[in-house]
Every structure is written in C-alpha cells, then in structure tokens.
Amino acid sequence: GVFNQLILHQKEDFRMRARTKKPPLDPVNAALSFLYAIMTTAYTSALESVGLDSCYGFYHALRSGRSSLSCDLIEETRCIAERIVLTQINLKILTRKDFEFQESGAVLLNADGRKKILTAWQERKRSIMTHPYLNEKIETGLLPYAQSALLAKYIRGEIEEYPCFLMK
C-alpha cells in the first residue's frame, strides 16, 4: 500500500501488509495501535469535558468497552499518528530493537519503543497549528478539545454544520 511507499529506510523491518490490531502483527501496526490508543484517551476526555458521551458514535457502532465517538473523531486526525510513526521510522529513531516479537505472532512496542513514541507524541502536541475553522493558532494537543467543542455546538444547534478537521 501507500504507507509502505512512504517508508524510506528500514523497509525490511517495517513492511506493513495490512492494518492489523488486537494483536498487531508487525511493527508499524504496533506503533500505530499504541498511538491510536493514546489519541482515544485524549478524545474521550475531551468529549466528556464538553458534555458528550464518548460511547455513542455516528460511524463506529456501539460496542462494549469502546469509545465509539472518540473513534469517529480520531478518523480526522489519523494522519498525525501516521506522520509520527513514519518520521520515527525514516529518521531511524524507531528500530526493530524497539519491539517484542511474540510466539503467537503478535508484535508489541517494548519500553524503549513506547518511550520514543510518547516523546514524539508530546513534541507534536506542543507544536502550533492554525485551526482551519476557528482560524486561531492552537497547540496540536488541544485539537481533540477544539473538535469536541465544535461537535457539541453542532449537536446543540449552535452552528449549522460540524466543521470536519482537514490537515493541509
């Protein structure tokens, strides 16, 4: 797929055949799953802070233990997680040594790998961006709260349509 074409270094160690989760079956999927879990927590907190129930989504079906609305909003920002993972791989910050390969076929980030991804995530959250709808400069880490607040305004009839976040 396209993701593999964006991997410029360490191609043999970071080949992704398909999206796999629970468990991830390759290093790329392990890193993405870890970041998506972090993002889910951020969106769940943001949604609940604006009075929305994160369990009831529009696109993702209601399922026990899943924050479906968080998953819906993460769809808009998957590119942030993907870019972090690609950058870590292409700069050779993340290497094969940062993963545990289990007999079952599951692949997980080890402590060093988690630290590298968390460090990159924290740096990205501090970066400044101009929100396309609000036309204000915000830290990327505030994006879950901005989008959650906009969704709440839409649901309450305060704005006519929900402004989907599009990265430029």
Name what the model sees in each region:
Residues 1-168:
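Active-site helix-to-loop segments that bind/position phosphate- or nucleotide-bearing substrates
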